[in-house]
Each structure stands twice: as C-alpha cells, then as structure tokens.
Amino acid sequence: KRRFPNEPEYHQAVEEVLSTIEEEYNKHPEFDKANLIERLCIPDRVYQFRVTWVDDKGNVQTNMGYRVQHNNAIGPYKGGVRFHASVNLSILKFLAFEQTFKNSLTTLPMGGGKGGSDFSPRGKSNAEVMRFVQAFMLELWRHIGPETDVPAGDIGVGCLLYTSPSPRDRS
C-alpha cells in the first residue's frame, strides 16, 4: 500500500491473492529470499499517455490511455483493452494482475497485461469511436507486438455495440 497509496482496486486484488497463498508461501523461505511477493505485485511496466482526438463537431477531446504490462515470465503480455468512463490506473493494474494468473492457468505461454482508456463509446458516432481508437493506437503501437504484448478486446471495444448508425455514418 505504501508504493501505490491511491489504488484501492489494485490493493484489493493483491490482498486477496496473498491471503490465499500465505500458508503455502510461508512453508518456503526461498520465496522470501527471491523477493517473490514484491516481484509479483509490482508490474513490469505501466504506460500512461494522453489520447487527443476530434469529435464530430470539430472539437478537440482529450482522454487518458493506459497499458499495464504486469508480468511476462511465461510469455508475451496478453490482456484486453477496455474503453469505459470508469477506467483508471488502479483498475487496470488490478485487471492485469488477475490476467497474469488467468493466463498462467491456460498452460499457453502468455503473460498478463491490461489496457484501456477513460473514453466511453456510449453516445458517440461510429466516426468518433474510430477517430478515438486510431489516436489511442497511435500512442500504444510502440509498446506492443506479437513477441511483446498482444492486446485483445474487452468492455467498450466494438463501436457497433454502443451506437446506432446515423445517416451521416453511412456516407
């Protein structure tokens, strides 16, 4: 909590995992010597960036973008990208932490990551969503790739789920 004092969602995830492994962990002093808990609880990398895009009225909008690369011990980072107004760094660190464990259980060589933005596609035109996603990816692309980080879809990814086509979208 001292390292990440304003991230309650992340604290919750870490505390839940640590409480379930505590008994087994305490049987192995070599885990402590290897600083396993701290290495597991601190993400490898966190990218935080501004996403600037233009809405249908020509106004410049700004959102925050994030990618948490939590752990790649068994393979490239793998995890979804979420677009929702509630997205913040604490939530994405929580989800990346969980994703690391989920992916390890698949037996596929994938680490854990998660990304997203506080952008909400709800109420936006398809063109606005497209402009936002293009701006988001222009920032994110340099940190991902098949051997490094493989994003996937998550909440809010898929413009047709939240918008209905208007006549201006069809032309």
Spans of features found by a protein language model:
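Single conserved hydrophobic/aromatic residue that forms the stacking wall/gate
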Residues: 162-171
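Metallocofactor- and cofactor-centric catalytic cores in central/energy metabolism, strongly enriched
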Residues: 1-161
